[in-house]
Regions:
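Helicase-associated low-complexity/disordered flanking segments
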Residues: 1-99, 175
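Walker A/P-loop NTP-binding motif
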Residues: 102-110, 122-138, 251-252
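Conserved SF1/SF2 helicase motif Ia
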Residues: 130-156, 169-173, 258-260
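Conserved Walker A/P-loop ATP-binding site and its immediately adjacent core
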Residues: 140-164, 205-209, 242, 269-275
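Conserved helix-turn-beta segment of the N-terminal RecA-like "Helicase ATP-binding" lobe
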Residues: 152-181, 281-296
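Conserved motor-coupling elements within RecA-like helicase/translocase cores
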Residues: 183-200, 291, 325
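SF2 helicase catalytic motif II
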Residues: 200, 204-209, 215-260
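Conserved interdomain linker/interface between the two RecA-like ATPase lobes of SF2 helicase motors
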Residues: 265, 269-346
Length: 346
């Protein structure tokens, strides 16, 4: 399919349609409309975006072989398609995911700041599952994951179902999980209160209720005594007054759970726009330290590591140099790119 040709034909048809509606006789108006067409005000050129190639960080199986992960993680984190599918192969990890797992193994708090689609959730789910398998909380809850929206919690619930229940061999220690938000009815909430899962998914509003409602505080917060992990997804959403509320909530949770060594994890696609990544890391670490109430070093802010997928030669793209990975604003695309037409063969 020639996407550029489709775009050109579509614009041409719409332009012919709109211009046929009214016959413009005034020369000034016609001149203005011609200028609008020349500047492509109504139909600008299409934007092209390239999917980044993240550097490989090995596989879950290799991390199990190295002793960085519990052997059972090899069975959990696999590519699965249906309920009874044990998975055809183990998950492959990106470099930033491996770095996060290594930092978590040392017991440090950290923040992951990488792009959309980079697998940020695995950077806390894998370490949490590993810790539950190695050192389960005898009181029940080992980790609380907080989302700013229920839609994100729902998506993560499905991922946990896929990894932790689909095709898992019988006889192995099960890692339990549950969602506790305003979506659950009374019966479902009662079941969570009784089961006390290893991993609890919630939002910051419901977490406030867990700390203030007597029954929920007694059952769930009591079961989270000595809490190991607190993960805040989409960290950049907690700003201003809401950020202050969540910061106080984190401190109250730490005290209520009697967890002075609580390991805090934050994930975000966008948090700082420094000139360099080193400057961005400092700013992100400062914000995360304020939010979590625990020291997060700039070196514990993990970013993505990309690999070049194009010809690195000096003439590959004008304006791109090894020391400057981004094209200069004045650099025009090469002519061979502008004249490129994908093959229409299947």
């Amino acid at each position: 399919m020639d996407v550029f040709g489709v775009h050109h034909d579509l614009i041409a048809e719409y332009e012919a349609f709109t211009s046929s509606l009214v016959a413009v006789r005034d020369p000034d108006i016609e001149s203005h409309l011609a200028g609008e067409r020349e500047r492509k005000t109504r139909w600008p050129d299409p934007k092209l975006a390239l999917n980044p190639t993240f550097r490989s960080g090995g596989t879950v199986a290799s991390l199990c072989d190295d002793g960085l992960l519990h052997p059972m993680c090899r069975e959990y984190f696999r590519h699965k398609k249906h309920l009874n599918d044990p998975g055809s192969r183990t998950l492959s990890l990106h470099q930033h995911q491996r770095e996060a797992i290594a930092v978590a193994d040392r017991g440090d708090s950290y923040v992951l700041s990488t792009g959309t689609g980079s697998g940020k959730s695995l950077t806390y789910i894998v370490p949490i599952v590993d810790k539950v398998l190695r050192h389960p909380n005898p009181d029940g809850i080992s980790a609380i994951v907080v989302y700013p929206m229920n839609a994100l919690a729902n998506s993560q619930l499905h991922e946990l179902e896929k990894y932790l229940t689909w095709g898992v061999p019988e006889g192995h220690r099960k890692v339990t999980f549950a969602r506790y938000t305003g979506q659950e009815n009374s019966e479902q909430k009662l079941q969570v209160l009784k089961s006390k899962p290893d991993i609890l998914l919630t939002n910051y509003v419901m977490l406030e209720y867990l700390l203030t409602r007597p029954d929920e505080r007694r059952e769930l917060i009591g079961a989270a005594r000595g809490l190991r992990f607190l993960a805040l997804d989409e960290l950049h959403t907690y700003r201003g007054r809401q950020g202050a509320d969540v910061a106080l909530l984190v401190r109250r949770l730490r005290d209520a759970c009697e967890a002075p060594g609580l390991q805090c994890i934050g994930t975000s696609a966008t948090m700082a726009t420094g000139v360099t990544f080193a400057e961005a890391r400092k700013e992100i670490a400062k914000v995360a330290t304020r939010l979590f109430g625990t020291k997060i070093e700039p070196k514990r802010v993990i970013g993505e590591t990309l690999e070049r997928s194009t010809d690195p030669g000096p003439d590959a793209v004008p304006g791109v140099h090894p020391a400057n990975p981004l094209p200069t604003p004045s650099a025009a695309p090469p002519q061979r790119l502008m004249s490129f037409r994908p093959s229409t063969r299947p």
